[in-house]
Amino acid sequence: MESMYYIGLDVHKRKISYCVKDGGGKLHAEGMISATRLDLDHWMKTLPQPWSAAMEATMFSGWIYDHLKPHATALKVAHPLMLRAIAASKRKNDRIDASKICDCLRCDFLPECYMASTAIRERRRTLRYRNLLVRQMVQMKIKISALLMESGVSYNKERLHKVGYFRELLATNPDIDEGLRSLLRQCRETVVRLSKIESAMIRSLRHDWLLTERVERLMSIPGVGPITALTWALEIGDVQRFSSIKKAVSYCGLCGAEKSSGNMVQRTPLSKQRNKHLQTTLIEAAKMAPRYSPSLALLHDRERQRGNANRATLAVARKLVAYLVAVDRGKTHFRIADREVCAA
């Protein structure tokens, strides 16, 4: 039986530090290579066989993972925060980091994190780019208001971004000079252009063969629209990786961390260790969901009487996560259980 060789990779923008050890911890090779596909191909030809590798999750890990995956017996990605706690040291450099990652992999002590498939990651990149466009549209709309206010121009803020009102405002308001009018037109054209691109991206994702059926099932849940459904499908990936709804709620950042010692139990505010894209989308969806679901409206009212509106919104968001997990696991359209109907 061939012995396995273990490789730790410390990945950076331009360089990758590596460390190769056998099962007994004997060092076979270490060094540094350029972070390019060609250099990785040359490097892999020098490796002893068979080999498995591990790297820390960074913004550069995706393409390296995809390039090495076909050649490795096993390839893992480590959770950065957990790995930092395990491999804490006074002395730290790229060579030592690669060696520690290699030892964690060799001893089966690597805090592995989930790596979505290439297809999901490519589509997720598109969705996150769409979120960037939305933020830029909001910035342009705020800039339009700021330009008008700093020039002392009166306007109707509820109608400002309506096409007809905006055109009429530019044409008839005497307080808008030619220089300001040009800037306002450019801002408006930017908003329109970004809106068209954003709409086209959402249409392409909704009609994507990999997502169509899944998104349609998720949208059967009251209060879940195309953006929430797409965000869930692409940020979660494989829903089976969550063994319980509580773990899914934690991943979405809808609960606080616990700090307990002795008889003292302390719950912190919402944890920063979460998927921020899912957290934002689910909280926004939870604000609208009670309008479409009597059971969610009842839950919101009950929680609001106990505390404040934010806690009620979080309770609805957690219930939405439970619905999303159930529909995604069962691969069926949403339906309310009989006991929930009776409770409502």
Each language-model region and where it sits:
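Phosphate-backbone recognition surface of nucleic-acid-processing proteins
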Residues: 217-220, 226, 230-309, 344
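Acidic beta-strand-to-loop metal/phosphate-binding motif
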Residues: 50-58, 101
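Low-complexity, acidic/Ser/Thr- and charged residue-rich accessory regions of DNA metabolism proteins
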Residues: 263-264, 299-344
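Gly/Thr-rich phosphate-binding beta-strand-loop-beta motif of the actin/hexokinase/Hsp70
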Residues: 2-22, 101
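Glycine-rich, often acidic, oxyanion-interacting loops/wings at catalytic, nucleic-acid
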Residues: 127-217, 277, 293
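Short glycine-rich, Thr/Ser-proximal phosphate-binding strand/loop in the N-terminal lobe
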Residues: 15-38
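Short alpha-helix plus adjacent loop in nuclease-associated cores
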Residues: 76-125, 166-170, 262-277
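Short, basic/hydrophobic alpha-helical segments
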Residues: 37-52
